[in-house]
UniProtKB/Swiss-Prot annotation:
Tissue: Expressed in adult brain, lung, skeletal muscle, heart, and 17-day embryo.
Descriptive protein name: Protein Wnt-9a
Lineage, top ranks: Eukaryota, Metazoa, Chordata, Craniata, Vertebrata
Gene: Wnt9a
InterPro entries the record matches: Wnt (IPR005817), Wnt9a (IPR013303), Wnt_C (IPR043158), Wnt_CS (IPR018161)
Lipid-attached positions, O-palmitoleoyl serine: 221
Knocked-out gene: effects: Mutant mice die during the first 12 hours after birth. Heart, lung, liver, intestinal tract, kidney and brain appear grossly normal, but the mice display skeletal abnormalities, with slightly shortened long bones in their limbs. The region of bone mineralization is reduced in scapula, humerus, ileum and femur. Besides, hyoid bone and atlas are hypoplastic. In the scull, the supraoccipital bone shows reduced mineralization, with increased distance between the frontal bones. The basioccipital bone displays an abnormal shape and is smaller than in wild-type.
Organism: Mus musculus (Mouse)
GO biological process: canonical Wnt signaling pathway; cartilage development; chondrocyte differentiation; embryonic forelimb morphogenesis; embryonic skeletal system morphogenesis; epithelial cell differentiation; negative regulation of cartilage development; negative regulation of chondrocyte differentiation
Keyword Acyltransferase part of the UniProt annotation: no
Modifications made to the protein after synthesis: Palmitoleoylation is required for efficient binding to frizzled receptors. Depalmitoleoylation leads to Wnt signaling pathway inhibition.
PANTHER family, A to Z: PROTEIN WNT-9A, WNT RELATED
Length: 365
């Protein structure tokens, strides 16, 4: 589990985190963090092979559902983008929940149990997975790593000029269409599936809402005789923040859940919320996360998490909450870190090694 206060520190440490995608029931099409197979350590860059159809083998190694595998094989760049998307989603999930009792534990048995239930945490996993794929695919298009898509083709922007001047727009139109088809949708009679698909779409919509128009002026002496504009996605860290807020305000739609199967029964619309289309559909029209079941406390080890015993916490920030009232242990240790760094000509950084004493807080069992 990743336990750091700075995103950059553990982004580098978790470089190798990726996926195996699940082959579920024929009518299902789940992806990444919401698959039933365990996440597996693989390189972010798939090994190169001399064969012309090497990407076929890459798609097969991901163990996709039949339709997903067919879509993967259409373009040599898809397989690597899928791997990148899941890694990005997992890292962002763990970063957003680093101060919470549930810190996005992705070990196989905990995640498998969680996905059988319609918790808020489950809703977040669906949203962050679809958002990660949408973001990664749009970026792959604009970076030229895909054969079936290039830069954004927004009719209101001068993409020819944007491309000429190096301002290639992220192709959200292609990526969102691909993701909706890739994730698919089971029968509308399957209520749990409709909730999952709704949360998938929330992830896509948050990506769309974060698109910004970036412009650059060109002309003599800094004049703006020509202005080139292109569309650009928000950093994925911002997407994660928005989805975390939606997690915190997730709407519960009533359910009866079979403990053995995790299948949801009848659900009723949340009070005061407009129903969606489809005659009595309880899902909101607005892009809000929805869940079926109340979440456990995640305080003690169980089916859904390893609990919080031994978890590091910050005394002034979250020890009381994370430790669930059990208190925390304090350990003093001496650490050595680079300090007083200076750039020397040419071309290296010279640092002193400074020692300092720090206190580490961990939850009692």
């Amino acid at each position: 589990m990743l336990d750091g206060s700075l995103l950059a520190r553990w982004l580098a440490a978790a470089f190798g985190l990726t996926l195996l995608l699940a082959a579920l029931r024929p009518s299902a099409a789940y992806f990444g963090l919401t698959g039933s197979e365990p996440l597996t350590i693989l390189p972010l860059t798939l090994e190169t092979e001399a064969a012309a159809q090497a990407h076929y083998k890459a798609c097969d190694r991901l163990k996709l559902e039949r339709k997903q595998r067919r879509m993967c094989r259409r373009d040599p760049g898809v397989a690597e983008t899928l791997v990148e998307a899941v890694s990005m989603s997992a890292l962002e999930c763990q970063y957003q929940f680093r101060f919470e009792r549930w810190n996005c534990t992705l070990e196989g048995r905990y995640r498998a149990s969680l996905l059988k239930r319609g918790f808020k945490e489950t809703a977040f996993l669906y949203a962050i997975s679809s958002a990660g794929l949408t973001h990664a695919l749009a970026k792959a298009c604009s970076a030229g790593r895909m054969e079936r898509c290039t830069c954004d083709e927004a009719p209101d922007l001068e993409n020819r000029e944007a491309w000429q001047w190096g301002g290639c727009g992220d192709n959200l139109k292609y990526s969102s269409k691909f993701v909706k088809e890739f994730l698919g949708r089971r029968s509308s009679k399957d209520l749990r599936a409709r909730v999952d698909f709704h949360n998938n779409l929330v992830g896509v919509k948050v990506i769309k809402a974060g698109v910004e128009t970036t412009c650059k002026c060109h002309g003599v002496s800094g004049s703006c005789t020509v202005r080139t504009c292109w569309r650009q996605l928000a950093p994925f860290h911002e997407v994660g923040k928005h989805l975390k807020h939606k997690y915190e305000t997730s709407l519960k739609v009533g359910s009866t859940t079979n403990e053995a199967t995790g299948e949801a029964g009848a659900i009723s619309p949340p009070r005061g919320r407009a129903s969606g289309s489809g005659g009595g559909d309880p899902l909101p029209r607005t892009p809000e996360l929805v869940h079926l079941d109340d979440s456990p406390s995640f305080c003690l080890a169980g089916r859904f998490s390893p609990g919080t015993a031994g978890r590091r916490c910050h005394r002034e920030k979250n020890c009381e909450s994370i430790c669930c009232g059990r208190g925390h242990n304090t350990q003093s240790r001496v650490v050595t870190r680079p300090c007083q760094c200076q750039v020397r000509w040419c071309c290296y950084v010279e640092c002193r090694q400074c020692t300092q004493r720090e206190e580490v807080y961990t939850c009692k069992g």
